[in-house]
Swiss-Prot record:
Function (record text): This is a seed storage protein.
Matching SMART domains: Cupin_1
Modified residues (Phosphothreonine): T108
Positions of disulphide bridges: C29-C62, C105-C283
Protein name (record): Cruciferin CRU4
Length: 465
């Protein structure tokens, strides 16, 4: 085959390849209708359940998010798991202990005698640790969590939760599977370090459904025995082959991990050990922020509510994950002025109450116009204008955004796009009088929240599929 033929073959292959990839995700964000989404799969375990939204749904595919809700019963332990994507987790309800294992970081929590004599001494591997008194444990950082906490977790970082309260612990998590930190396909892939998922990963298209086991299950027991310097019998227990408790298990008796005292406030700093720059960046970096404190809100009006934002300025690890969050709480008939996300997609999850939401796409079509309630999820794509009005005594929500410094622009209000336009542009653009143009530009003095004078009108019907 000559050079000309090779070149022709190369361009033909390239054309076919681009055609194939174009067919893989054609017009992902050409959305003429949005819907309030509910979970499509429930994974039950001994100590709780995981509810998974279908991230192949058009609007979630557009946003790039995979979304999950965790319900962990009292004394339930969500076993260590890591993902192929960075994620933000929000504590909707309850209290918990949380631990994360960041690769290469030291065990900074230690000196707690939690194991008795004889444990860990298998095959002469006790290493002389406290014989007769039991040896002392050490592990990476453990944090107390409460309602309103938002946790940033990089890909590949194993994470666990323990419900140490008396009520169910409810968490929601958004993983950005479209981010370049995910080097696999656009599927959420949990890698289990312990436990299993008897129902399998039903959201993975093209894979035969089968039980999902933990990572150790794939290794030969003899290899594990050599790697951990334990017996083959113990190695087989690591594989959880005959146990179907799921990935959330019930803890029997006391949960004796080393933990700090409960936080007295949000400003406390953990003492840091001397180390190199990498350790200071990854190992001691703060990963949790509480968004339920109105005193630290970005927008606060006692009669209307508050809005708090979380971005890479107040939680620097988000710069690495390229994610941010917004927490909102508004009273009945309060309205969030019409706005759009300048540089991010958003996934809005309702944590309390109800609201009427309208959403408009790039064709000027109303693609969403209905009430949304607790437990439902709505995607707001980049540039789609949205307005929210509370229809219950209190409406609360959390938004996850696909940019670490997500920005909004408002259509009405003191800092809106209309306020920045000359009166002549408004008057001529909408064919209205100068007096009407002044009213459009200057009548609304608020920047974000305002009082609604009544229910949102329906006007022209929304576009139906």
């Amino acid at each position: 085959m000559g050079p000309t033929s090779l070149l022709s073959f190369f361009f033909t292959f390239l054309t076919l390849f681009h055609g194939f990839t174009a067919q893989q995700w054609p017009n992902e964000c050409q959305l003429d209708q949005l819907n309030a989404l509910e979970p499509s799969q429930i994974i039950k375990s001994e100590g709780g359940r995981i509810e998974v939204w279908d991230h192949h749904a058009p609007q979630l595919r557009c946003s790039g998010f995979a979304f999950e809700r965790f319900v962990i019963e009292p004394q339930g332990l969500y076993l260590p798991t890591f993902l192929n994507a960075g994620k933000l987790t929000f504590v909707v309800h309850g209290h918990a202990l949380m631990g994360k294992v960041t690769p290469g970081c030291a065990e900074t929590f230690n000196d707690s005698p939690v194991f008795g004599q004889g444990q860990g001494q298998e095959q002469g591997q006790g290493q002389g640790q406290g014989q007769g008194q039991g040896f002392r444990d050490m592990h990476q950082k453990v944090e107390h969590l409460r309602s309103g906490d938002t946790i940033a977790t990089p890909p590949g970082v194993a994470q666990w939760f323990y419900n140490n309260g008396n009520e169910p612990l409810i968490l929601v998590a958004a993983a950005d599977i479209a981010n370049n930190l995910n080097q696999l396909d656009r599927n959420l892939r949990p890698f289990l370090l312990a436990g299993n998922n008897p129902q399998g990963q039903q959201w993975l298209q093209g894979r035969q459904q089968q039980k999902q086991n933990n990572i150790f299950n794939g290794f030969a027991p003899q290899i594990l025995a050599q790697a951990f310097k334990i017996s083959v019998e113990t190695a087989q227990k690591l594989q959880n082959q005959q146990v179907n408790r799921g990935n959330i298990v019930k803890v029997q008796g006391q949960f004796g991990v080393i933990r700090p005292p409960l936080r007295q406030g949000q400003g406390g700093q953990q003492p840091q050990e001397e180390g190199n720059g990498l350790e200071e960046t990854l190992c001691t970096m703060r990963c949790t922020e509480n968004l339920d404190d109105p005193s630290s809100a970005d927008v606060y009006k006692p009669s209307l509510g508050y809005i708090s934002t979380l971005n890479s300025y107040n939680l620097p690890i988000l710069r690495f994950l390229r994610l941010s969050a917004l927490r909102g709480s508004i009273h009945n008939n309060a309205m969030v002025l019409p706005q759009w996300n300048v540089n991010a997609n958003a996934a809005l999850y309702v944590t309390k109450g109800k609201a009427h939401i309208q959403n408009v796409n790039d064709n000027g079509q109303r693609v969403f116009d209905q009430e949304i309630s607790k437990g439902q999820l709505l995607v707001v794509p980049q540039g789609f204008a949205v307005v929210k009005r509370a229809t219950s005594q209190q409406f609360q929500w959390i938004e996850f955004k696909s940019n670490d410094n997500a920005q909004i622009n408002t259509l009405a209000g003191r800092t809106s796009v209309m306020r920045g336009l000359p009166l002549e542009v408004i008057s001529n653009g909408y064919q209205i009088s100068p007096q009407e143009a002044r009213s459009v530009k200057f009548s609304t003095l608020e920047t974000t929240l305002t009082q609604s004078s009544g229910p949102m009108g329906y006007g022209m019907p929304r576009v139906e599929a």
